[in-house]
């Protein structure tokens, strides 16, 4: 039977994992949602094409997404230390998680918004709707189911990234799995942390998909 110290450590690891995942996803959407909207609007088939702006954001998104997350973690250590004063722990890990999440979210949002029927957008435009109204009242509303599915996928991805951050000083269940499973060869603790990560992932997926189904305008 494990000691109370190990049990408390795992409980703390769960909360740290939730903290990193949820905060990173929330802040990532603060950046990624507007970025995705701008990518959609400024594309050649968007409601306000702007080739230069689209290309700049497109390149930024591709560069960040093209760097493996474990390398991005190491690459951003100086920047993370500058922002939060240290490069280790759950709070510090949020910095690279947000930077990794934002362009990923932007692409998810762009993909969702481009699924909106062009006829619906044209109908709104013919009735005199402004671009802002088309974005907020038509595109985002029509794409809400796809956006919720994207958010669900994003949560799962960020959860995996948060676990990966344990390899370079991040907190949470990932750090416990690596410290005890890889370094100390305590397989039982590693297996429990992996199971807990799977459970968290399943909870995110189940809740997210139920919400997406609830707000599906086609039903």
Language model feature labels by segment:
Residues 161-191, 195-196, 216:
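Glycine-rich helix-loop "coupling/hinge" segments at transmembrane-helix boundaries
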Residues 64, 81, 124-126, 156, ...:
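Helix-capping/transition residues at the boundaries of transmembrane alpha-helices
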Residues 113-143, 183:
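Short helix-to-coil transition segments within interhelical loops
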Residues 131-161:
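Transmembrane alpha-helices
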């Amino acid at each position: 039977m494990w000691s109370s110290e190990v049990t408390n450590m795992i409980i703390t690891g769960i909360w740290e994992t939730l903290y990193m995942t949820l905060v990173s996803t929330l802040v990532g959407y603060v950046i990624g949602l507007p970025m995705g909207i701008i990518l959609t609007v400024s594309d050649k088939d968007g409601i306000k094409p702007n080739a230069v702006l689209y290309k700049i954001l497109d390149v930024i998104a591709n560069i960040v997404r093209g760097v493996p997350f474990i390398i991005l973690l190491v690459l951003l250590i100086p920047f993370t230390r500058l922002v939060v004063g240290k490069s280790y722990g759950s709070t510090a890990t949020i910095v690279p998680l947000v930077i990794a999440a934002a362009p990923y979210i932007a692409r998810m949002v762009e993909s969702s918004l481009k699924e909106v029927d062009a006829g619906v957008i044209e109908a709104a435009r013919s009735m005199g709707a402004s671009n802002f109204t088309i974005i907020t009242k038509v595109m985002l509303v029509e794409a809400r189911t796809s956006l919720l599915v994207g958010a669900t996928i994003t949560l799962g991805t960020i959860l995996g990234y948060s676990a990966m951050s344990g390899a370079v000083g991040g907190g949470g269940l990932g750090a416990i799995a690596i410290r005890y499973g890889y370094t100390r060869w305590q397989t039982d603790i590693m297996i429990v942390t992996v199971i807990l990560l799977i459970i968290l992932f399943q909870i995110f997926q189940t809740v997210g998909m139920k919400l997406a189904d609830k707000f599906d305008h086609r039903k």
